[in-house]
Swiss-Prot record:
This is Dual serine/threonine and tyrosine protein kinase. The gene is DSTYK. It is an enzyme of class 2 (transferase). ATP binds at L659, G660, R661, G662, Q663, Y664, G665, V666, V667, K682. SUPFAM superfamilies: Protein kinase-like (PK-like) (SSF56112). It is found in: Cytoplasm; Cell membrane; Apical cell membrane; Basolateral cell membrane. One of its GO terms (cellular component) is basolateral plasma membrane. Residues 383-428 form a coiled coil. The keyword Lipoprotein does not apply.
Length: 930
């Protein structure tokens, strides 16, 4: 029977076995929760991948930016590729949570290992009388596992049993026969040599953990044994020592283990046989040789005692136990090793949750922005194009005379230069005799044509430059902005139609343009500079009449092609040009081109608008899916993984006296937890899935925020699965504890300067939340806590959400709720409204309800009055500037409420003025400062 026949000491092995069972049972329970969370996480990512087809992939890449958001960390590179469980992380976590614990006993020699095994199991199962050296010993590996019946067999590791007659099979045994432990030297069967001895026993400890006694060094080194087990089980390594000192081979073995595996090891000095099992206690100043050797090997350090007491941070460290009665520390050591493993796994899983949850939130911002800004961009594009069209038509209608003058001026300024260039011109593809004899009429026509082309090209460039400068302002005021806006619309539409192309846009800009035809029209009709400089179709049409006019000139064959002849041809061509006709032709064709471009643009824009209409419907569906399904579901998994991490590191908090009750939970005093003292513990029992989701998201937002002096710190969370006797599940939120809330402070009486400082603190806290993209939605007296110096901190982020994650639900405390909250469409200005009401209480100095609200018989009556514009009354003690600030903050039109960046300096000015005035005139109140 377990526990009988073992070496005895004070307390016996039963206590050690019970403690070890508790440690491994604790591990297995938490491992089961971690495995469940991992299964749900994998299922979540599968559901996200296949939900609504490719809708999520197309929606993930929209938008051009996101606010900092709760938690930060955006995704700008395709989105959907990151909303996934990376394969390497999934495989690593799956492997980690599938490991079962195993106690591996190493040692100086077989006797030490066997003696330790016998002590642990409370039975003399292995013989301890072997006298051969460890290097010459040939004992095989021994594995002890749980079963209902005692059984001994040879088995290949993780494979099958060998059919082999063993000494233990011949009859009853208490100690396993020596010959079954040995590897026979004459055995020719390789399977027999590598097989391990498997011992099945009905012991309670073996239900929780397998125990393996390593083979002797003569058969397999400790390093090789560890190599086999490292990626299969969770090892708790024990090193049994029977001698007063480690031998050189022991030191070398331990040194190699440390270099290769960096494992913490529990070193135990087994008692000498036949000697009193209770070793004499050493004083703190006495350090054994073993301790010094392990210090030199860097297994032990001076920051924890030689007795093996656990370190304060509960990180697994090697221990040395030289007294049998302290073997119970093996339970502490095992718990630390197991805890470290669980914490690392829970942390890795929570990092996956938080990373993807932050991406979801940032994408919700992107989608919300897309829904808001796309219709405005379409309207802006239509309006600006129309303004551009009308402006260019006005130029064509009103500036014909200016164009005529411009052409005359250009010709006049360029005439000499043109004539000189024509005289020096070298003709192409025409052979001119050196003696200047006349050439054929065909060659003469070619010469004339080349001179015409020279004049046309030079005049084209000069007039184009003049025309560009005349409409230069249009390029900046219309075309540039219009093009950027249109490009953004086209890109977002293209991504929705062809999601895969969004990844290629950095390589090929043309790929993501949805309407190349529309772009060509804009380039031809509106980009005046590009059109004239590039010699496009418009340019050729504008100057076609120039060619026709020049070609109608009658030429007399010259006696020879000389410089004078070329100059004469050029001069006649220039003089034959009509500036008025050219100007009229330019304006006429310009108007024609503008009309056709305008009509084509309008048609293309309607097509683009239709495409965006369908895309925005899908985006809104996806936005709802993210807000109401994906993000809350992932947030709950994140809450569970983080709570598991917290309970492993810091344990379950102890509830003190009740401090107060709220709508969704009870607040208790908690003396200390996780190194924080004192704490407040909020116990919340979510009644349904919606409240679970809200709580999980609240927790994520609070944990994502950096510590801020105007917000109450959240230290951690623990999920109590046995709350109320196991009838329900409670979430315990451990927070910073402060002195009192503002409601209690006002009832007790606070000085004016203190109250105004509290108002400044509240504004600073709300501003920080808004800077992180969060809206509190429940600013009130009870949610402002005061420390012992009466400095304020905002608490209870139960209704706090990023704007993009708000569903329009009606939340908050009635008297602090802005009118637009009842419509379901609101933004962070609801916090400004609530602050206005809070400021009324701060300035009044009491907690009595405003008369207008006190007369209301019900919440519905109160809400109706607020919607109709009823607000708190002005009290006689109010300063004029304070009253104006209140009225501005609770304005019924949310767009007219001041930004908190404006409110804060106003409050500071009020405080400086009133408090300085009060110090000079102690009896002066708020009403005297108007």
């Amino acid at each position: 029977m377990e526990g009988e026949g073992a070496p005895s000491w004070r307390g016996g092995p039963g206590g050690l076995i019970r403690e070890l069972c508790r440690s491994f049972g604790h591990y297995n329970r938490h491992l089961a929760r971690l495995q469940h969370n991992l299964r749900e996480t994998k299922k979540f990512f599968r559901d996200v991948k296949y939900s609504q087809g490719n809708l999520f992939a197309s929606g993930a890449a929209i938008g051009e930016g996101s606010p900092s958001g709760a938690g930060g960390g955006g995704t700008r590179d395709g989105g959907q590729n990151f909303i996934s469980f990376p394969r390497h992380e999934e495989e690593h976590l799956q492997q980690t949570v599938s490991w079962h614990p195993c106690l591996l006993i190493l040692g100086q020699n077989c006797n030490a290992k066997c003696q330790l095994l016998n002590i642990l199991l409370g039975e003399k199962l292995l013989p301890t009388t072997k006298i051969s050296s460890e290097e010459n010993c040939k004992r095989r590996r021994i594995r002890f596992t749980h079963g209902t019946q005692t059984r001994v067999s040879l088995a290949l590791p993780e494979q099958y049993e060998l059919v082999h007659m063993m000494a233990a099979h011949r009859g009853h045994w208490d100690t396993i026969p020596e010959e079954d432990l040995e590897i026979r030297g004459d055995s020719e069967d390789p399977a027999h040599r590598i097989a391990e001895l498997e011992v099945v026993l009905p012991y309670s400890l073996l239900k929780e953990v397998d125990v393996v006694v390593a083979p002797c060094r003569g058969f397999q080194s400790a390093e090789a044994t560890l190599e086999e087990y490292m990626n299969q089980v969770l090892l708790i390594v024990i090193f049994a020592i029977s001698e007063a000192e480690l031998s050189s081979s022991d030191e070398n073995e331990l040194r190699e283990i440390k270099e290769k595996f960096s494992l913490p090891i529990f070193f135990f000095k087994v008692p000498e046989s036949g000697v009193e099992l209770i070793s004499p206690k050493k004083t703190d100043n006495e350090k054994s040789s073993l301790y010094c050797q392990l210090m030199d090997l860097e297994y032990l350090s001076t920051n924890h005692c030689s007795c093996g007491a656990p370190s304060p941070d509960a990180v697994a460290q090697s221990m040395l136990v030289e007294q049998l009665e302290k073997l119970r520390l093996l339970s502490t050591f095992s718990r630390q090793v197991l805890q470290k493993h669980l914490v690392e796994a829970a942390t890795s899983l929570n990092e996956v949750h938080c990373r993807c949850l932050n991406i979801f939130i940032n994408q919700a911002f992107d989608m919300q922005r897309d829904l808001q800004i796309t219709p405005k961009r379409l309207e802006y594009t239509r309006r600006k194009e129309n303004e551009l069209y009308e402006s260019l038509m006005n130029i064509a209608n009103r500036k014909q005379e200016e164009m005529k003058d411009m052409i005359i001026e250009t010709l006049s300024n360029m005439k000499e230069e043109l004539l000189e260039d024509a005289a020096n011109m070298e003709f192409k593809d025409i052979i001119i005799p050196e003696n200047g004899e006349p050439v054929s009429s065909k060659d003469i026509k070619c010469c004339i044509k080349q001179i015409q082309e020279l004049i046309i090209s030079r005049l084209n460039q000069a007039v184009a430059n003049k025309l560009i400068s005349s409409v230069d302002y249009l390029r900046e005021s219309f075309v540039g902005t219009l093009e950027r806006c249109l490009k953004s619309l086209e890109e977002s539409w293209e991504v929705s139609v062809h999601p895969a192309r969004s990844l290629e846009k950095s390589k090929d800009v043309s790929v993501h343009i949805t309407s190349n035809y529309l772009k060509q029209i804009l380039n031809a009709a509106y980009h005046v500079e590009v059109t004239f400089h590039s010699g496009s179709t418009v340019t050729r049409m504008l100057w076609e009449q120039i060619k026709q006019i020049i070609q109608r000139i009658t030429w007399v064959s010259p006696p020879a092609i000389t410089s004078d002849w070329k100059r004469k041809v050029a001069q006649d061509a220039i003089e034959s040009l009509s500036a008025s006709k050219l100007a009229k032709s330019i304006c006429s064709q310009f108007r024609t081109r503008l009309n056709s471009s305008h009509e084509a643009f309008a048609a293309s824009l309607r097509q683009l608008e239709d495409g965006h209409s369908g895309r925005l419907e899908k985006t809104e569906d996806l936005w709802l899916k993210v807000r109401k399904d994906h993000a809350p579901r992932l947030a709950r998994l994140s809450l569970e993984s983080r709570s598991l991490q917290d309970v492993l590191l810091h344990g379950k908090p102890k509830l003190g006296r009740e401090l107060g009750r709220g709508q969704y939970g009870v607040v208790y005093l908690c003396d200390s937890w996780g190194g924080h003292f004192p704490c407040a513990l909020k116990s919340v029992v979510p009644p349904d899935e919606k409240h679970w989701n809200d709580l999980a998201l609240e927790f994520h937002y609070m944990r994502s925020l950096q510590s801020h002096e105007r917000l109450v710190d959240l230290h951690g969370s623990v999920i109590d699965y046995g709350y109320g006797g196991g009838s329900s599940i409670a979430v315990l939120l451990i927070m910073e504890r402060l002195h009192r809330d503002l409601y209690t402070g006002l009832k007790a009486g606070l000085e004016l300067e203190t109250r105004l400082q509290i108002a400044l603190d509240v504004v600073e806290g709300i501003r920080y939340l808004h800077s992180q993209g969060l809206v509190h939605r429940d600013i009130k007296l009870k949610n402002v806590l005061l420390d012992k110096k009466n400095r304020a901190k905002i608490t209870d982020l139960g209704f706090c959400k990023p704007e993009a994650m708000m569903s329009g639900s009606i939340v908050g405390t009635p008297i602090h709720m802005a009118p637009e909250l009842f419509t379901g469409k609101y933004d962070n200005s609801v916090d400004v409204y609530a602050f206005g009401i809070l400021f009324w209480y701060i300035c009044s100095g009491h907690v009595k309800l405003p008369e207008a609200f006190e007369r209301c018989a019900s919440k519905d009556h109160l809400w109706n009055n607020v919607r109709r514009g009823v607000r708190p009354e002005r009290l006689p003690v109010f300063d004029e500037e304070c009253w104006q600030l209140m009225e501005a903050c609770w304005d019924g039109d949310s767009s007219q409420r001041p930004l908190l960046g404006i409110v804060q300096p106003m409050l500071q000015g009020i405080m400086d003025r009133l408090c300085k005035s009060s110090s000079e005139h102690p009896n002066k109140g708020l009403d005297d400062s108007t």
